């Protein structure tokens, strides 16, 4: 798997990020299983497995996902520009139109309309 970046590590990262964005735990589980299968190789020779090292970093610190209702897109974009760690923005029909919901990993905070509260949660 010496190709930089390896197709397998990119696929695993895709499963992980898509799983977080869509709330599909089976995709997250798939990424974790792929990472586990490579763990010993990465530990032994991390320089030859940089794509996998990045995946392990994303497993340890997932990218925040900000889900937003139909009329909250502008606020979500402001948060994306202002946050210390820019979240992945995902439109979400299951929350109120003016609400936003911050998710990190598989944990989501209560839906919120206030931009300041979301920014505060992102900076913690």
Show the residue positions of the predicted features:
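Glycan-recognition and catalytic cores of secretory/periplasmic carbohydrate-active enzymes
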Residues: 1-124
């Amino acid at each position: 798997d010496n190709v930089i970046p390896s197709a397998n590590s990119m696929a695993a990262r895709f499963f992980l990020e898509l799983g977080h964005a869509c709330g599909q735990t089976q995709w997250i589980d798939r990424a974790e299983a792929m990472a586990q299968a490579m763990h010993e190789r990465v530990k032994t020779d991390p320089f030859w497995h940089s794509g996998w090292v990045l995946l392990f970093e994303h497993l340890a610190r997932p990218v925040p996902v900000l889900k937003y209702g139909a009329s909250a897109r502008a606020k979500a974009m402001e948060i994306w520009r202002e946050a210390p760690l820019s979240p992945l923005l995902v439109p979400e029909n299951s929350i109120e139109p003016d609400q936003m919901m911050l998710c990190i990993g598989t944990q989501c905070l209560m839906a919120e309309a206030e931009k300041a509260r979301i920014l505060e949660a992102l900076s913690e």
